Amino acid sequence: MKILRKNHPLLKIVNHSFIDLPTPSNISSWWNFGSLLGLCLMIQILTGLFLAMHYTSDTTTAFSSVAHICRDVNYGWLIRYLHANGASMFFICLFIHVGRGIYYGSYVLSETWNIGIILFLTTMATAFVGYVLPWGQMSFWGATVITNLLSAIPYIGNTLVEWIWGGFSVDKATLTRFFAFHFILPFIITALALVHLLFLHETGSNNPSGLNSDSDKIPFHPYYTIKDLLGIFLLLLALMILALFFPDILGDPDNFTPANPLNTPAHIKPEWYFLFAYAILRSIPNKLGGVLALILSILILAAFPLLNTSKQHGLIFRPITQTIYWTFIANLLVLTWIGGQPVEYPFTTIGQIASITYFTIIIILMPVSNTIENNIIKL
């Protein structure tokens, strides 16, 4: 008798991707975050769908519709907080996933890596337009400040900003289109994630040793389905603790005040997961320069495959680059902290030093340490 999962046209695809997929036998828990990102995406789409059933994208009722969801809809408060904190969990998993890719040299799988960068940018865009929807003070002013950055583009900047706003300021048209974008983008992310998986399964997964593992592969199921389940339970536990005990800890108090164009908050800042990029943006006094630095802070990830000169795969046997890598992570945390601080001394100076360090590590220090380690091998 033929096994259905191996012969059915649709099940065959699922089988080759999640059941009989040949997987390196030594991949660690750092490889769990891909599946956790898939889970986060499903949670966000489901909770978002239920929120969209009760939300109204109109400037006069948006804020009160969110209050209505929390007060009057059955378990609306839970759905809303799962969605808001689910975004934070999404980005935590995303940062770890990218960090693991850098540490273990997964960027050599260039198609998978480049699709991943597009996924990262799309997720950031989705989170940004989503943050505008509750129409609180920080939502409104965050939207105004970030969209206004496009005016730095020569010649077409001002026209582009007004085109995105749908008028001469952030208003009803802006909110409506941001809601439309926020609804459609997760489905684009899902499609991109499938392409990401497709490219990954063309080459096979990387592993911690950085060595070829073709001679030592095991089926994905049951070994890694069980391993992923543990990660899933831990993620759900963390999300539930966050949503039930500390639902507003990662939010901004200003967002409990309805949007008011006549009153600017003392410190305008985005959600915590954008603070590192926001700090880089603020560290450059020139508007266009800041915007370029902001874009480059993400796009520089595409330079990793190009700047890699090491004869070894990953950092597991490379102590010099390991030290530089962890300095880079510490520097990212400093940038995140600085992004949430007011624009005054000493924070501006620290931000400028951390921003220079961010780019220096990637463009100069890592390639130099690669060359040093290559020469040490020859000795």
Swiss-Prot record:
Binding site for a ubiquinone: H201
Chain segments annotated as transmembrane: 33-53, 77-98, 113-133, 178-198, 226-246, 288-308, 320-340, 347-367
InterPro entries for the chain: Cyt_b/b6_C, Cyt_b/b6_C_sf, Cyt_b/b6_N, Cytb/b6-like_sf, Cytochrome_b, Cytochrome_b_C_euk/bac, Cytochrome_b_N_euk/bac, Di-haem_cyt_TM
GO BP: mitochondrial electron transport, ubiquinol to cytochrome c
Residues involved in heme b b562 binding: H83, H182
Cofactor(s) the protein requires to work: heme b
GO cellular component: mitochondrial inner membrane; respiratory chain complex III
Coiled coil: none
A GO molecular-function descriptor: metal ion binding
Membrane topology note: Multi-pass membrane protein
Cofactor annotation remark: Binds 2 heme b groups non-covalently.
List of residues binding heme b b566: H97, H196
Keywords for the protein's UniProt record, in alphabetical order: Electron transport, Heme, Iron, Membrane, Metal-binding, Mitochondrion, Mitochondrion inner membrane, Respiratory chain, Transmembrane, Transmembrane helix, Transport, Ubiquinone
Subcellular location(s) of the protein: Mitochondrion inner membrane
Misc note: Heme 1 (or BL or b562) is low-potential and absorbs at about 562 nm, and heme 2 (or BH or b566) is high-potential and absorbs at about 566 nm.
Summary of the function given for this chain in its UniProt record: Component of the ubiquinol-cytochrome c reductase complex (complex III or cytochrome b-c1 complex) that is part of the mitochondrial respiratory chain. The b-c1 complex mediates electron transfer from ubiquinol to cytochrome c. Contributes to the generation of a proton gradient across the mitochondrial membrane that is then used for ATP synthesis.
Self-association state and partner proteins as the record states: The cytochrome bc1 complex contains 11 subunits: 3 respiratory subunits (MT-CYB, CYC1 and UQCRFS1), 2 core proteins (UQCRC1 and UQCRC2) and 6 low-molecular weight proteins (UQCRH/QCR6, UQCRB/QCR7, UQCRQ/QCR8, UQCR10/QCR9, UQCR11/QCR10 and a cleavage product of UQCRFS1). This cytochrome bc1 complex then forms a dimer.
Family classification: Belongs to the cytochrome b family.
Name assigned to this protein: Cytochrome b
Annotated organism of origin: Akodon mollis (Soft grass mouse)
